[in-house]
Amino acid sequence: MAGGELWAEESRRVEVHDVEHDSGSWALTWTSAVTNRRAEPLRFGSPTTAGREMAGYTGLFWRGPRAFRDGRIIGPDGEGPGLMASQSPWLALSGEHDGADGHATVVFEHAPANDHTGAGGSHPAHWFVRNEPFAGIAPSWAFFDELELAPGDTLTRGYRVVVADGAWEREEIAKYLRTHPW
């Protein structure tokens, strides 16, 4: 509420599933539905839409531990920090643990209903991802352009986050996502 006026209502659902002790992986799905309750449009932006170059984070954001600095950024068709602002169904970051001989991989995947490319008429999403000066991933729906939500409209977005022991390769990630459908 702003000045006593209700601007928006959100319904959020978080579920943990696909816990696999053998592979050391588990998944979390996160779904949010925000409804504009104002009589005028709501505008969602990012630091990039406000003029700060390549800082287009919005929505769900994961900031990794210090150990993931300089971690490996992996996408379906590429690798590295150059995937910042790219579009793809999923993106992963793999890093080495501090003080232990081990790695972990975190995979973010758009829900099929997200229309993340905008091909179906939705506002397109781009990945905010970095491994320096900190590790972070956000499937940003207002990276380059503000998203306008009309009065009474609802913005629904869903994501799956997979957390896995080990430094997974692109093929392992793709296989996991194929064999664990939404």
Where are these regions (language model features)?
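Short solvent-exposed strand-capping/beta-turn motif centered on an Asx-Ser/Thr pair
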Residues: 35-39, 166
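A general secondary-structure signal for short beta-strands and their flanking turns/coil
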Residues: 7, 25-27, 55-57, 154-156
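A structural signal for short, well-ordered beta-strand segments
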Residues: 12, 32, 157-161
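Active-site loop segments of alpha/beta catalytic cores
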Residues: 18-29, 61-63
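Extended, loop-rich substrate-binding clefts of extracytoplasmic carbohydrate-active enzymes
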Residues: 1-24
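Active-site/ligand-binding surface loops and adjacent short beta/alpha elements
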Residues: 41, 45-116
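Beta-strand-rich recognition/accessory modules
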Residues: 107-182
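Short, well-ordered beta-strand segments enriched in hydrophobic/aromatic residues
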Residues: 28-36
